[in-house]
Swiss-Prot record:
SUPFAM superfamilies: Acetoacetate decarboxylase-like
Protein's UniProt name: Acetoacetate decarboxylase 2
Gene: adc2
Lineage of the species this protein comes from: Bacteria, Pseudomonadati, Pseudomonadota, Alphaproteobacteria, Hyphomicrobiales
Role this protein plays: Catalyzes the conversion of acetoacetate to acetone and carbon dioxide.
Family: Belongs to the ADC family.
Organism from which the protein derives: Bradyrhizobium diazoefficiens (strain JCM 10833 / BCRC 13528 / IAM 13628 / NBRC 14792 / USDA 110)
Keywords: Decarboxylase, Lyase, Schiff base
């Protein structure tokens, strides 16, 4: 194979049989169970990278179980993980802290293209009589269980769609061949072409179990704030580099107590 042929075909590995195809990545009948809970603000500060900012007065985590039965190039799979509400340069969004799923294609593609923090796990999302149930197993151990009353009340579709349209942020890290970081970037991406099919709220509960390699319980559940069940079709948009950690220092806005020192 000639060098020019390698360059033309270079998209993903292995070169002759990539783990995932080029996009667009369209998802049909995507289903979410999102349980928002209050946690320890010090724990959040320890895991959210600057220049993203937290609201210390409202330290929240969104625990998500997502069923994806029909996705272009990725197939049929389920995902589970934690998203932390943040702001970046005055715009609110979500920081993807950890994700576990059961499909090689989106694990490889998610990490390589966007920088999703994906690891192999065994999540499920299903309806059992009157209850929506999400679980996450890592190996033989259960590390997360979420439950919600099935379609108790309709949610405000305008608010739900606006939340889905907010930017999301990822910390993309790709090492060099010597182990040093070759790419270390804050990546922003959005969900696009959203067709919201329904959204509901109801009572919910969430249990997280400590695990050395699936440390979702490191952000402990102090109080359940809300729960949301969503069905939608959407496209996963490609990302843009919002901040390059190898090229520029983080620019943190001055706090009120600091402004007086520079005026």
């Amino acid at each position: 194979m000639r060098e020019n042929d390698v360059r033309k075909r270079a998209f993903a590995m292995p070169l002759t049989s990539p783990a995932y195809p080029p996009g667009p990545y369209r998802f049909v009948d995507r289903e979410y169970l999102i349980i928002t809970y209050r946690t320890d603000p010090a724990r959040l500060r320890a895991v959210v990278p600057e220049p993203l900012e937290l609201d210390d007065r409202n330290p929240l985590v969104k625990y998500e179980f997502i069923r994806m039965p029909d996705s272009n190039g990725f197939g049929d799979y389920t995902e589970s993980g934690q998203v932390i509400p943040v702001s970046f340069r005055g715009h609110t969004g979500g920081y993807n802290h950890c994700m576990f799923l059961n499909d090689e294609g989106p694990i490889a593609g998610g990490r390589e293209l966007w920088g999703f923090p994906k690891k192999l796990g065994q999540p499920t999302l299903r309806t059992e009589i009157d209850t929506l149930i999400g679980t996450l197993d890592y190996g033989p151990l259960r590390v997360a269980t979420g439950t919600m009353g099935y379609k108790h009340r309709e949610a405000d579709l305008g608010q739900v769609k606006a939340a889905l349209e907010e930017p999301n942020f990822l910390l993309k890290i790709i090492p060099h061949v010597d182990g040093s970081p070759r790419i270390c970037e804050l990546v922003e991406y959005r969900l696009e072409q959203i067709a919201l099919k329904g959204a509901w709220t109801g009572p919910a509960a969430l249990s997280l179990t400590p695990h050395a390699l699936a440390p979702v319980a490191d952000l402990p559940v102090l109080e359940i704030v809300s729960a949301l069940h969503i069905r939608a079709d959407l496209t996963l948009g490609l990302g843009r580099v919002a901040h390059d950690y190898l090229q520029e220092p983080a620019r943190r806005p001055f706090r009120a107590s600091e402004r007086s020192l520079v005026t």
